[in-house]
Design a protein with these regions (language model features):
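Glycine-rich phosphate-binding loops that contact phosphosugars or nucleotide phosphates
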Residues: 275-424, 506-545, 568, 572
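Glycine-rich, anion-gripping cofactor-binding loops and their flanking helix/strand elements
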Residues: 150, 159-165, 169-187, 313-347, ...
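Glycine-rich oxoanion-binding loops at beta->alpha junctions
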Residues: 48-61, 258-271, 295-331, 478-494
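Active-site phosphate/pyrophosphate-binding segments
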Residues: 131, 243-247, 251-281, 371-500, ...
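Generic C-terminus detector
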Residues: 236, 527, 540-542, 548, ...
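Structural motif
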Residues: 45, 73, 279-281, 327, ...
Length: 593
């Protein structure tokens, strides 16, 4: 796992005599090897970890594994426990003390507390603890009083179990690469799953809801691409189809449909400053900037606070006016985008509250944030962003709704209406993806186009921008997005029988106006492809092709209407024989200017 970067390493080893040896070292794994070389490294079960500091500085003390107060448990963890501060306060009230400044130590102490208080076995205590946790994790836990087992679990952080000979040995890692030399039989744990690995027995998997899961063993080769694509031809296609699950992960623990409320610790941490904000400034690049445009409309509509959306690369250099009452929101999939990070740091220097919306746990923007929200959509490998966009839009939706409700701009009844609809989005996404065969056929007609226009109004305008970006990124077709009303101010001059014009024309308050815009293109023989709400006959009678999305509230529609546009871009690129996952001249994470 060294290729991922780290600042310290550690290992815990169990022998059969209820003895546990733990060795840690700051710096390279070679430092750990040297320090442990002359010590007892016997044992038949072990867990190890390479750490990249998030909570707590790089040090031997903060390195994993972390040990429970009674010395019985050891735990390694990737991810961040978002509510660790509240849990730590609770445990301190129960008499627990802490040696490190990490969130991970809080988790292992919580597991001990549950064992002591409720008499649960290791697996039961882990499950109970994780039900109280908000955040991302991939963990492995051992108990020296039960030295024949390891309990592992994951949420929004990858975890792979390699199956050895006769199911009598197991290997754990964040991905398959470190363990393929030992076995090619892998089980990829899904979010919310807990696995019990016991010496000489087959693995058992359960969900946090205590549902049994049949382990699905995959035979893999040593090609990392094959391992990570999950059977899909490209990462991008896999990530498009991942979106219903990703959005479920994104809202889990935040959108509480039964309790009819939205819970965001980010608001609670800085409630006064957020509620008194005079302005929000969103800084982002590329796809994240498009998500920010949607966020602007939602925050202004629901919280009644003005919002500026800035390209981070422009914002950082133009001597912007930033005041202490401002809240600056940085949006970035990787959390490492150089311009966005620099703009964020500038805002921090000027006294603004810095709010991060990122996907990668522990990234630079995450560490620089005063507060923020992880999208929790999982690693995104394809250069052309897909699930990161929908995750960002969902997080912004939750944030804007929660903020508006706190400020009294949204009634409880209105909030409940949105909560109900948002909880249905993952299933509605699946319905959109079920139309992929139709989308593929429509895409074929765009393969030889040299240009394309994308049009939308209101919340659909940023969707049009994002659809155009996807097409140009991976198919190399020149595509531009515009507000549909701006068509008469220039773009309509480009419309003829060879110009595809893609309209995002779902039902909203400006529907009749965009219908007129579609008629204008039709009158000039433009080739019209439209994303519409199911049952829309008016557009269907005009357009060359239509793709329907399930009926939903207008503000929520971008989460659905973007999916066909992602698929169109993907299929066009495949038809053209292009490298979908690694388009020319582009990088996944732009960490330099």
């Amino acid at each position: 796992m060294e290729y991922r970067g780290y600042d310290s390493a550690g290992v815990a080893l169990l022998a059969g005599d209820h003895k546990m040896n733990i060795y840690k070292s700051k710096g390279k794994v070679s430092n750990l090897e040297e320090s442990a070389a002359s010590k007892d490294i016997s044992g038949h079960i072990g867990i190890a970890h390479t750490r990249w500091a998030t909570h707590g500085e790089p040090s031997t003390l903060n390195a994993h594994p972390h040990v429970s107060q009674n010395g019985r448990l050891a735990l390694v963890h990737n991810g961040i426990i978002e509510n660790y501060s509240n849990l730590k306060t609770f445990l301190e009230g129960k008499g627990f003390t802490f040696k490190s400044s990490t969130d991970t130590e809080v988790l292992v102490q919580l597991i001990q507390f549950i064992q002591d208080e409720y008499g649960k076995d290791l697996e039961g205590a882990v499950v109970s603890a994780l039900r109280r946790v908000t955040g991302a994790y991939a963990i492995a836990v051992v108990d020296k009083e039960n030295p024949d087992k390891i309990v592992v679990a994951r949420k929004s952080s990858p975890l792979v179990v390699g199956i050895g000979e006769d199911h009598k040995e197991f290997f754990l890692a964040s991905d398959a690469l470190p363990i393929v030399e030992y076995t090619k039989q892998m089980v990829y744990l899904n979010d919310g799953e807990v696995a019990l690995l016991k010496v000489g027995q087959k693995m058992e998997i359960h969900t946090l809801d205590n549902e049994d899961v049949d382990p699905k063993i995959k035979e893999v080769d040593v090609n990392l691409d094959t391992l990570e694509k999950g059977g899909y031809e490209h990462f991008m296609l896999k990530e498009i189809y991942d979106q219903p699950r990703c959005i479920s992960d994104c809202i889990r623990g935040r959108l509480l449909a039964d309790e009819k409320k939205i819970v965001l610790s980010a608001i609670n941490q800085h409630r006064d400053r957020l509620l008194r904000a005079s302005r929000f400034i969103i800084v982002a690049c590329g796809t994240s900037w498009h998500a920010g445009l949607i966020g602007k409309q939602m925050i202004e509509q629901w919280a009644k606070i003005p919002v500026d959306v800035e390209y981070a690369s422009e914002f950082r250099y133009r001597k912007p006016v930033i005041q202490p009452g401002d809240v600056v929101i940085a949006i970035s999939q990787s959390g490492e985008t150089a311009d966005t990070l620099a703009a964020f740091e500038l805002a921090k220097e000027r006294g603004a509250l810095c709010f991060g919306i990122v996907n990668v746990v522990g990234s630079s923007i995450a560490r620089a944030s005063d507060t923020g929200i992880y999208t929790h959509v999982g690693p995104e490998i394809g250069v052309a962003s897909t699930k990161a966009f929908t995750g960002q839009v969902m997080v912004l939706t939750l944030f804007a709704l929660a903020l508006g409700h706190e400020l009294g701009s949204i009634s409880q009844m209105e909030l409940e209406k949105y909560i109900t609809e948002l909880s249905l989005i993952p299933e509605k996404m699946k319905k959109v993806l079920e139309q992929d065969a139709l989308t593929k056929d429509i895409s074929r007609t765009l393969t030889y186009a040299r240009n394309a226009l994308y049009m939308g109004r209101g919340f659909n305008y940023p969707v049009a921008l994002e659809g155009a970006l996807k097409l140009k990124e991976i198919s190399y077709i020149h595509a531009e997005g515009y507000p549909a009303a701006e068509m008469k101010h220039g773009p309509i001059a480009l419309v003829d029988e060879n110009m595809p014009v893609v309209f995002v024309a779902t039902h909203h308050q400006l529907y009749k106006k965009i219908l007129s815009n579609i008629q204008e293109v039709k009158a000039r023989n433009g080739r019209i492809i439209a994303i519409v709400t199911e049952g829309d006959e008016a557009v269907k009678n005009i357009a060359e092709a239509t793709i329907e999305i399930p009926a939903t509230l207008p503000v929520v529609a971008p989460l659905l209407s973007i999916l066909p546009l992602q698929l169109i871009a993907y299929h066009v690129a495949v038809f053209k024989g292009l490298n979908v996952d690694q388009p020319r001249n582009l990088a996944k994470s732009v960490t330099v200017e």
